[in-house]
């Protein structure tokens, strides 16, 4: 049994910000402050006992047809490789919790290909908080030099969590954020995909060996060759690694072999 969380936007973001948000909605004439406050204070179940029970009950129906077949001639316009691998009959019409309902009407258990798309399951009820945020006009579009309060708060919470700091302990938080000691986790880079995260980590390592441009100081390990450890496959090669979507990371799993070999031959 999971311990259900039931929270509101106000619980997460604080009364001061919500107060400013409600007043801003009123100023725009979108809704009055009282209506906005009601939305902001609505407590949302993340994973209720009812949903947990349904999730458990559906397990026995995996692989069985539980709904009518959806038939369509629409094949899309993917590349030949994607089209060859595609399985329309297993494609989701909808989903719930740990399951998806295929076009063939069968119930499928969320598997490997969905693991990072649905970490909280399909139709996660906690996302109703996002619906409420949209109704209140909490903006998603922004830029690095105008990161909104929500983004800044989440960065702070991540640093606190990574360092075992209570949210209310502002003194310890300020000390960690100001630290320049090595191996202190006190910075957050906002990225939306796994590929970009891998690329960022890769560049952080390269920056210790090579200058990004002429304005940068000489790196700590200038003149040395960076070495990256990768996961071997069952054939003794490197094709078992994460594929990535950028050229350099793809070379880590044996792709672009001529490019990779040329880099190695030239000491890169």
Regions found by a protein language model. Name each.
Residues 146-154, 193-198:
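Phosphate/oxyanion-binding active-site loops and adjacent basic polyanion-contact surfaces
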Residues 136-144, 183-188:
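Glycine- and acidic
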Residues 8-20, 26-101, 108-109, 113-119, ...:
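Active-site-adjacent loop/helix segments that line or gate small-molecule/cofactor pockets in enzymes
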Residues 2-23, 31, 92, 103, ...:
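PLP-dependent aspartate aminotransferase-fold enzymes
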